[in-house]
Amino acid sequence: ERQTRATEWYYQIEKGFSQTNGGQAKSDPQSLEGVRGDLYDHSVPGGGDGMAYAYGQCTWGVAARMNQLGLKLKGRNGEKISIINTMGNGQDWVATASSLGGETGSTPRAGAIVSFVGGTHGTTASYGHVAFVEKVYDDGSFLVSETNYGGNPNYTFRKISQADSAISFAYTTK
């Protein structure tokens, strides 16, 4: 079954993912090549956000990834909380998750939402950035998938060496 699923995903990556608003969600092939084995739930990012976020923006990418994986915010009391279409700019997502009752923290976990304070880690000062944690490595570094980092509307991947005071996390659950 894994081979069948992998073949289906490979085909989708090559063809792109149709969106109702006309956008195409694709994983950047060059960026994907080195991280394929480290992706959360062994699935390649793609699909629609189901929330009407602006296609290609970082907020759209995280909403689409959560939608694809069937993830919800993990509530502080274990409940499952849906993200909303007004989570704010990228730098606001973790604070909004907290205000909705979501569990947040400063430690990366696979499947978490990660917000970057504006003007840090290569983000715009006004909006910040949001990404999805695909994997946490033994040394504390973590792999993120993201859209609109550096203006690229496709999913790209980068490894963050460690969490710092400009990074916060909202935790998710299935």
Model-found features: residue ranges?
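Aromatic- and glycine-rich peptidoglycan recognition patches
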Residues: 127-174
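Alpha-helical oligomerization segments with coiled-coil/rod-like character
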Residues: 1-13
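Secreted/periplasmic proteins that engage bacterial cell-wall peptidoglycan
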Residues: 17-130, 135-137, 145-146
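Intrinsically disordered, low-complexity segments enriched in small/polar residues
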Residues: 8-9, 38, 51, 153, ...
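Compositionally biased, intrinsically disordered low-complexity regions enriched in proline and serine
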Residues: 11-12, 41, 54, 138, ...
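Residues in intrinsically disordered, low-complexity segments of regulatory proteins
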Residues: 8, 59, 92, 168-170
